[in-house]
Amino acid sequence: MLPARLPWVAAAGAATLAAGVVFADAPATAATNDEIRAMVAEMLSDAQTRSSLLQAGAAAGHDGHFFLASPDGNFRLEISGQLQFRYILNFRDNGRDSANNPIDDFEPGFQTRRTKIGFKGHIYDPNLWYNIKGAFSRSSGVFDLEDAEVGYNFDNGMAVKWGQFKLPFLREELVSSSRQLAVDRSLVNELFNQDRSQAIEVSYETDAWRVFGAFSNGFDADNKEFNAKPADWAITGRAEVLFAGSWKQFKDFTSKPGGEDGLMLGLAAHFERGKDAPGAPPISDRFSWTIDASWESDGWSLYGAFIGNHDSAGSSETGGSVDEYGWLVQGGLYLTDDLEAFARYDMVIPDSDQAGDNTFNTITFGANYYLHGHAAKFTTDVQLFLDDVAGTETLEGSEKGIGFLDNGAESGEYVVRFQFQLLF
């Protein structure tokens, strides 16, 4: 709108100037009419020229993303957002949680699970890119930085990036929250995931395989000062092999009717050196590993993963170290072109030497209705938490982000979730 209005702004300015001349020296008005008309014409011509330059100097629109770009394509800014709004019903047995607080057997309520704003693009060269994303807290509304990364893609398949981002470890965590199969990720993922860290990552990709390597401040080290990070240093590596299909189709966990066959295997490992500080507890080194497989075809998809975690400090119960495991399997099947049913089973396996060494099992099932793909979809599911927190020491209480509340020694909790997602 601004370029179109520039001639009118210029004309108004010229008229104002002319009025000033008239009132300042009325007798001279007749003698200066030609000069005023010439000045107005010159200003209008100049404004029209600037308007044309503005129109020719930038591009804007929507090609899957809202964007602003230079005509030569060397500069581009994309603006995006994500909104997830839920209604949750949580059912537990009366009793007390692990902190000995009384349990309310029915907890219903709305939740704004995710509200995110993102900016990404490139400058000077399409290979020199940036990505900045933040989210508003669902409990306080405070805006918090998630991703802040800069990278460069080389022509030979190699790439490097640095900043704050998710380390290349669990695939379920690496797949965007906007592209999950169920309402949210699994309980196993919430316990073992890498989250974000401040790091440098180098990657290499071919049509059949790709590898990622990162040097970082450790798992869950986002928005930390350099002297307040959880580890002195950490390294993470992930390798993926593509047996069929394309990399693009594995950006989510679903496969639409008519989708091509795809099969991918992933392996990852992470080691971090615990902080060595005077007067601090013994150094706790961490080693985590995972293997996962993704298979999808015409209207159906399958995914499975196994995760292991070794903590060298551990506890006195385990003789100085803890070994914990988790696994999950999930699948989706389209019933119509827009309706997809899904189910998931996941299990947490604590160290057998701990007092709370019972496995914790969760069953999830539900459906997606896609109005416009992931950009506008309705999801509903039911989670059955079959065991109790007190019997599984790996659990640390509630995971409210997925609707799970601390059930103490009472098993049999179940949760019903309804969610609408909008992406722009």
Regions found by a protein language model. Give the residues of each.
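A generic local structural motif
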Residues: P3, D252-F253, S288
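Outer membrane beta-barrel
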Residues: G64-A221, A228-W247, K251-D261, V322-P350, ...
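Intrinsically disordered, low-complexity segments enriched in small/polar residues
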Residues: A11, A18, Q55, A59-H62, ...
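Bacterial N-terminal signal peptides that target proteins for export
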Residues: M1-A12
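Outer-membrane beta-barrel pore domains
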Residues: P27, A31, A58, R92, ...
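N-terminal presequences and immediately downstream first alpha-helices
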Residues: P7, D34, A38-A41, G237-V241
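N-terminal periplasmic/intermembrane-space "pro-region" immediately following the signal or transit peptide
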Residues: L2, L17-Q84, F91-R96, W247-F250, ...
